[in-house]
Amino acid sequence: MKLLEERILKDGHILGDNILKVDSFLTHQVDFSLMREIGKVFAEKFAAAGITKVVTIEASGIAPAVFTAEALNVPMIFAKKAKNITMNEGILTAQVYSFTKQVTSTVSIAGKFLSPEDKVLIIDDFLANGQAAKGLIQIIEQAGATVQAIGIVIEKSFQDGRDLLEKAGYPVLSLARLDRFENGQVVFKEADL
């Protein structure tokens, strides 16, 4: 997605060897116009897939997931990283390791929001090692629902997340694919769209 790649080049900041900071438009402050375009692109791509729910993980996946769900006219569910007292029955959980935060969290979704009839599109902000998507897949499958595809805003193609998911049989669509960081600049790999 050319618009997204341009924004990454303009406002993204490389930290170390493998971190891209995009807090000015995705991971802290949200550019709703860009997120709306991202949502439209995902919705157009998956319009024929019969999607009934969009699922993401808090927090930075919420914005692109909301706009995707809006464009598809289906509910969006986000997995919570912390249990609260209102989530006390029928909770579906999985362990998820965060590459950026270097911690493992138990993420959860109330089972009442997913059913075996659901066809789910997972949307997330980044794909690195695939652990967030893998955890969401586990939760979705605990409910008996089907993962139709995984939509990623920014993929770190130099990490093994995509291979892990595709080898497990899940289609992955990434709007921006980072090939590498070179001389303080992002070098893109050809995106899926």
UniProtKB/Swiss-Prot annotation:
5-phospho-alpha-D-ribose 1-diphosphate binds at A128, N129, G130, Q131, A132. One of its GO terms (molecular function) is xanthine phosphoribosyltransferase activity. It catalyses: XMP + diphosphate = xanthine + 5-phospho-alpha-D-ribose 1-diphosphate. Xanthine binds at L20, T27, K156. Its EC number is 2.4.2.22. Its main location: cytoplasm. It is found in: Cytoplasm. It holds the Pfam family Pribosyltran. Gene3D superfamilies: 3.40.50.2020. SUPFAM superfamilies: PRTase-like. InterPro entries: PRibTrfase_dom, PRTase-like, Pur/Pyrimidine_PRTase, Xanthine_PRibTrfase. Keywords: Cytoplasm, Glycosyltransferase, Purine salvage, Transferase. Pathway: Purine metabolism; XMP biosynthesis via salvage pathway; XMP from xanthine: step 1/1. GO terms for cellular component: cytoplasm. Homodimer. HAMAP family: XPRTase (MF_01184). Belongs to the purine/pyrimidine phosphoribosyltransferase family. Xpt subfamily. Converts the preformed base xanthine, a product of nucleic acid breakdown, to xanthosine 5'-monophosphate (XMP), so it can be reused for RNA or DNA synthesis. This is Xanthine phosphoribosyltransferase.
